[in-house]
């Protein structure tokens, strides 16, 4: 949904959540007209359980959830995508090689090296 709107040149409204780990904050964002949220997993106090709860709620109410992670971490990327996150942001990607690694971790073969989960 978000990708298509951006591709079509539409303006999308979103925000970053850095402090509030209560999943129902997403309902407030959705009711306020937001189309996506970015959960700050780099500086915020969130753990995988909170990410999973927020992603599940976002999916159920039609709010895209992206997660900012601290760095290039195959395990974290795989878990977030398996949870159903709509995407992720990674700070300090400085080289083509680093960007290519992120793509490989995010996509299934033959375009990438993402493993297959038994639940997704």
Regions found by a protein language model. Name each.
Residues 32-36, 82-87, 107-108:
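Glycine-enriched alpha-helix->loop->beta-strand junction motifs that scaffold or abut catalytic
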Residues 48-82, 106-111:
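Alpha-helix-loop-beta-strand connector modules within alpha/beta enzyme cores
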Residues 3-7, 30, 55-59, 103, ...:
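Surface-exposed amphipathic alpha-helices with a cationic face
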Residues 1-16:
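N-terminal amphipathic alpha-helix/helix-capping segment at the start of soluble metabolic enzymes
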